[in-house]
Regions:
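Hydrophobic aliphatic residues
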Residues: 62, 174, 222, 295-296
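Residues at or immediately preceding the N-termini of alpha-helices
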Residues: 68, 105, 215, 235, ...
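Generic structural signal for individual residues within well-ordered alpha-helical segments
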Residues: 94, 109, 116, 168, ...
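Short, charged, intrinsically disordered terminal tails
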Residues: 299-303
Length: 303
């Protein structure tokens, strides 16, 4: 079932077109990523989904209907701008957020205890928010979006500013939320996290959809074959080899992008035929970062 449907949505602020004719669908039990550089329209898109901003054009349906008050309690939202009631204790803060979303006091207290333990902050339950580190505060705000078991979770740059340990915790929790059937949509410019999580993604550039698909579809569209090698010899020879499209040097190693139909044995033979002594040779899958850089440069892959 489609939980979020955006069709041809656009939004301008004066002469600036922040979002242009953007369409996507998010199904239950999936994680959907909206990827783009800062200023590409990610936050504006999310605010339109939540009815904080009204689209100039297009249609947004949540659970198959336009946004209404009843839907608010079905959605969990982490905004890009972080903020907690700094003088409130963590327990009181989470219970308050839960009750705002329709939980009873007892339900909210039970959920608060569960989530605080889940993210490793049980000993901080009775501390004021201002006593927590920035990373701790961010985890509390994250779980405040989940405390009422929403069926739709929308997270705007959830990993921004987190250390690696806290990032792993959030990644794990997002997978857990997906497994219980929620639809999760998040925006990010941190590609390694998106690559681990998403079932489907949309790249946006200057407010426009430039690429949409599953991870497999996106990687298949950019079908160049990548090799990582270390050679004893002149690296400048690499760019002259058959089917080589691009060479990047990383110290004594090189990442070589070749045409999509290049077989590893074929490329290795070409290296040896050129008189190069190969010390390391491996085929690597194009990363989402590689694809992202191409998309942001305006390359669209195969048609």
């Amino acid at each position: 079932m489609e939980k979020i449907e955006a069709t041809g949505i656009s939004k301008s602020f004066g002469e600036v077109r922040a979002v242009r004719d953007l369409s996507f669908r998010v199904e239950e039990g999936t994680i959907y990523g909206i990827l783009g550089v800062n200023g590409s329209g990610k936050t504006t898109t999310i605010r339109m989904l939540l009815n904080i901003l009204t689209p100039d054009q297009g249609e947004i349906l949540i659970n198959g209907r336009p946004f209404d008050e009843e839907l608010k309690n079905r959605i969990g939202y982490l905004p890009e701008e972080r903020g907690l009631y700094r003088k409130m204790k963590v327990r009181d803060l989470l219970c308050y957020m839960g009750e705002l979303k329709g939980l009873t006091s007892a339900q909210a207290n039970k959920k608060a205890s569960y989530w605080v333990e889940r993210v490793g902050l049980s000993e901080w339950m009775d501390k004021k928010a201002e006593e927590l580190s920035k990373g701790m505060q961010q985890k509390i705000q994250f779980v405040s979006a989940l405390i009422h078991d929403p069926e739709i979770v929308i997270l705007d740059e959830p990993f921004s500013g987190l250390d690696p340990i806290n990032t792993v915790t959030l990644l794990e929790v997002m997978e857990e939320v997906k497994k219980r059937g929620a639809a999760v949509l998040f925006s990010t410019h941190i590609l390694e996290h998106a690559e681990k999580l998403v079932d489907k993604l949309t790249f946006i550039r200057q407010g426009q959809n430039v690429l949409t698909g599953t991870m497999g579809e996106v990687k298949g569209r950019f079908a160049a074959t990548l090799f990582r090698i270390r050679i004893d010899g002149e690296g400048s020879l690499l760019s002259s080899l058959p089917k080589v499209l691009k060479v990047q040097a990383f110290g004594h190693e090189y990442e070589v992008e070749t045409e999509g139909d290049t077989e590893p044995t074929e490329f290795l033979k070409n290296l040896l035929a050129a008189g190069l002594r190969v010390e390391k040779f491996e085929k690597v899958e194009p990363s989402l970062t590689n694809i992202y850089m191409k998309v942001m440069r305006g390359e669209d892959g195969k048609n």
